[in-house]
Amino acid sequence: ICTGAIALALASERPDCEIIAVDRMPDAVALAQRNAQHLAIKNIHILQSDWFSALAGQQFAMIVSNPPYIDEQDPHLQQGDVRFEPLTALVAADSGMADIVHIIEQSRNALVSGGFLLLEHGWQQGEAVRQAFILAGYHDVETCRDYGDNERVTLGRYYQ
């Protein structure tokens, strides 16, 4: 879920997999489509969708997402490169957790039994994200650290 570099990298590195990438912003979809064409990546389908709305009835072995997870009051939003990004791509309500929780809950209907959900999140959100996974019924929940030793990606497995 999201059409940026992660989806294109997955498709490029795993030509044996079919990747479906979604984004609600038309400009992001158009850019990803141009990049996929420029890079000659054939195993990716890029759709405009508000999370799962265009994916009704489909089931996936794995869902990977880099959703908005920054608190709208975070002072870093006024610094560095993020100043040039659309806020809707960065900011989520409820201390940055609203979209994460939504994806965790909605992914249960979109995963095959035993399928994986992987979510990037803020470096201080690991515990809250793990708890959201567990409360939603996911198993084998774990958080991976980035190169700066910060909790950055949480994954879990959901059984129907």
PLM feature spans:
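Conserved SAM/SAH cofactor-binding pocket of Class I
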Residues: 1-76
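Residue-level signal for inorganic ion chemistry
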Residues: 6, 32, 66, 81, ...
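Short, well-ordered coil/turn elements that cap or connect secondary structure elements
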Residues: 14, 41, 85, 135-138
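Residue-level signal for the nucleotide or nucleotide-sugar donor/cofactor binding architecture
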Residues: 27, 31, 65, 85, ...
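Mobile active-site "lid"/loop adjacent to the S-adenosyl-L-methionine
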Residues: 69-99
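Short loop segments at secondary-structure junctions
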Residues: 73, 158-160
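Conserved Class I SAM-dependent methyltransferase catalytic core
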Residues: 94-158
